[in-house]
UniProtKB/Swiss-Prot annotation:
Protein name per its UniProtKB record: Uncharacterized sugar kinase AF_0866
Family listed: Belongs to the FGGY kinase family.
PANTHER family: GLYCEROL KINASE 5-RELATED, SUGAR KINASE
Native species: Archaeoglobus fulgidus (strain ATCC 49558 / DSM 4304 / JCM 9628 / NBRC 100126 / VC-16)
Domain of life of the source: Archaea
Length: 492
C-alpha cells in the first residue's frame, strides 16, 4: 500500500493505492484567504495539520508502506525552525500582491546584465549555429528572457522578508514550497525535490544549485532553503514509515501520463492549465518564453521539460457558474456542443495572460447579439482556453520540432469532451485522456513505487478516450489571435 498526500490549490487529498488500484481517497478543503484583491493566502498551519492527520489515517487504517507527497508549486512558505510554526500565511501561486516588487527586482542591474548577456548569446548563435547545443550557451540564451514574475516563489519570499524587516533576526527562518513544508512537519527534515526547486525562480536548473545572484536580490541566503534530493530518495520517516515519492504536481502528471520520451506533450487542465513538453536529459532554452524546468530527477535518470501555463481554465469555468450562466459545470460540454454560433470569441484574461504573453490585458467577449445564448458564451469560453493551449503548443513545435502526433490530458477539466475535442481540432493532434483525472497523485504513487522496487518505468495510467482532429478551426483561431492582439492595445 502506498499513501499519497496531494496538496492542491483547492483541496488536500489522501489517495491510497494497492499496486495500481486506488482503494481509498479522502479530501479536505485548503483554507484560503483573500485579504485584498489579487492576494491569495493559504493557512499553512491548517495545511500541515491536515497532512499529518492524513498520514496517520494512511498508517492506522490502511497500513501503508510509504507516504508520498505531491503539491502545487511556487506557493511560498516561511516558518520558524525554533517552533516549527509558519511566520506568515503561505502565499499561493496565484497571489499577485508583489507585482510592483517584481518590477523593481527586474530593474536590478544583475537581471539587466544577465538579459544583455543572453541577447548577445542569441546573436552569436545566429552566426554560429553549432554553438546552440552547448549547455553554457543554452543557459545564456535562457537569461535573455530572465524575468522575475509575481507568481514565482522568489518574489513572494522577498515580500515576506521585507515585511519582517528587522524582526527576522528573532527567528531561525526556513523557507520553501509546500512539499518542503509538509516534509518538515512530517519528518523534521528541511528538504525538497528537484522538480519543486526548479519552479521557484531561485534555482539554476542548468547547474543544479540555488542561484546566488537571485538570492542576493531576494535578500535570502542558502542556509534558509532546503536541500534538494531525487524524488525517489528517502526524505525521512513519519512514525517509522518512509516518506518518498516527493514530486511537484505537473511533473507527477507528466510521469503518470507516460510522457517519458523527448517530444511527449501533456496538458493538465485543473484550476489553471499547464502544458509540458519532455525535452530529454539536457536542459533547453526557449526564446519564445517557455519555462525551462526539471521534470524529475530520480536516482537512475533525469528529465527536463519546457512549460507554458494558463492562470485560469477550470477556475474560469467555475466563474461562469458563479455568475449564473449554468448551475453545474458538468453541463458545459453538452451546452457548448448545442451552440451553433461560430462568431463569438472570448479572451480569457481574468488576472492577465501567462505564457507566452505575461501581460495584464482586459478580458473580452466579442460578437454579442440579441440572438446569443448561454450556450454560445460557454462555447466561446471553452474554445478560448483551447486556443490558449494551441498558442503554447505552437511555440513548442516551432522551437522543438519533435515528431509527435498527440497530447495527453488529465485534470478535472479534462472530463469535458467538447473542450478536449477543440484542443484536437485547433492543434491538429489527437488528444488522449487519462483514465485517472488526478494524474498528480497517481504519478507520485508511481515514483514512490519505483523507490520501493515495485515496478519499472514502463507502467503508466490507461487512457479512456481519444479525440481525433475533425474540424478545421484555423480561420477562427486566426481571428481569435487578432482579437487578442487588439486586447493588448486596448485602453478605455
Amino acid at each position: 500500500m502506498i499513501g499519497v498526500i496531494d496538496a492542491g490549490t483547492t483541496t488536500i487529498k489522501l489517495a491510497v493505492y494497492d499496486e495500481d488500484k486506488l482503494v481509498a481517497i479522502k479530501k479536505e478543503p485548503v483554507v484560503k484567504h483573500n485579504p485584498k484583491p489579487g492576494w491569495v493566502e493559504i493557512d499553512a498551519e491548517d495545511l500541515a495539520r491536515k497532512c499529518v492527520s492524513f498520514a496517520d489515517t494512511a498508517i492506522d487504517e490502511y497500513g501503508v508502506e510509504v507516504i508520498a507527497i505531491t503539491n502545487q508549486r511556487t506557493t511560498a512558505v516561511l516558518w520558524d525552525g525554533k517552533t516549527g510554526r509558519p511566520v506568515f500565511n503561505a502565499l499561493g501561486w496565484q497571489d499577485m500582491r508583489a507585482n510592483a516588487l517584481a518590477e523593481e527586482m527586474n530593474r536590478d542591474s544583475t537581471i539587466r546584465m544577465a538579459r544583455t548577456a543572453g541577447m548577445i548569446a542569441r546573436g552569436v548563435v545566429k552566426l554560429l549555429p553549432t554553438l546552440k547545443n552547448k549547455r553554457r550557451v543554452k543557459w545564456l540564451i535562457t537569461l535573455s528572457r530572465l524575468s522575475i514574475r509575481p507568481n514565482h516563489t522568489s518574489v513572494k519570499l522577498c515580500w515576506m522578508l521585507r515585511e519582517l524587516g528587522e524582526k527576522k533576526e528573532k527567528y531561525d527562518l526556513k523557507a520553501g514550497t509546500v512539499d518542503s513544508w509538509l516534509v518538515y512537519r512530517l519528518t523534521g527534515e528541511h528538504l525538497t525535490d528537484y522538480s519543486n526547486a526548479a519552479a521557484t525562480g531561485l534555482y539554476d536548473s542548468y547547474y543544479l544549485r540555488w542561484s546566488e545572484p537571485i538570492l542576493k536580490i531576494v535578500g535570502a541566503d542558502e542556509e534558509m532553503l532546503p536541500k534538494t534530493l531525487e524524488s525517489d530518495r528517502i526524505f525521512g520517516e513519519y512514525r517509522n514509515v518512509p516518506v518518498t515519492g516527493v514530486i511537484a504536481d505537473q511533473s507527477a502528471s507528466l510521469y503518470a501520463l507516460g510522457c517519458w520520451e523527448e517530444g511527449d506533450i501533456k496538458a493538465t487542465n485543473g484550476t489553471g492549465t499547464f502544458v509540458d513538453l519532455n525535452v530529454g536529459e539536457e536542459p533547453q532554452a526557449s526564446p519564445g518564453g517557455l519555462l525551462p524546468l526539471i521534470a524529475w530527477k530520480l536516482k537512475s535518470e533525469m528529465r527536463y521539460m519546457m512549460e507554458g501555463m494558463l492562470f485560469y481554465s477550470g477556475s474560469a469555468v467555475e466563474k461562469l457558474k458563479e455568475i449564473g450562466i449554468y448551475d453545474d459545470v458538468s453541463k458545459t460540454s453538452e451546452m457548448a456542443f448545442r451552440s451553433k454560433n461560430d462568431d463569438m470569441l472570448l479572451i480569457p484574461s481574468f488576472t492577465g495572460l501567462a505564457t507566452p504573453h505575461y501581460v495584464s490585458v482586459p478580458g473580452l467577449l466579442y460578437g454579442i447579439s440579441n440572438a446569443m445564448t448561454r450556450e454560445d458564451i460557454v462555447k466561446a469560453l471553452l474554445e478560448s482556453i483551447a486556443f490558449r493551449i494551441a498558442e503554447i503548443v505552437e511555440i513548442m513545435r516551432k522551437e522543438f520540432p519533435y515528431e509527435t502526433d498527440r497530447i495527453r490530458c488529465d485534470g478535472e477539466m479534462s472530463s469535458n469532451d467538447f473542450f478536449l475535442q477543440r484542443i484536437a481540432d485547433v492543434t491538429g493532434l489527437k488528444v488522449e485522456r487519462g483514465a485517472v483525472l488526478s494524474g498528480t497523485s497517481f504519478g507520485a504513487h508511481l515514483v514512490a513505487g519505483r523507490a520501493l522496487g515495485k515496478w519499472k518505468k514502463d507502467f503508466c495510467m490507461p487512457f479512456d478516450k481519444v479525440f481525433e482532429p475533425s474540424l478545421d478551426l484555423s480561420e477562427k483561431y486566426r481571428r481569435w489571435k487578432r482579437l487578442l492582439e487588439i486586447s493588448k492595445k486596448l485602453k478605455v
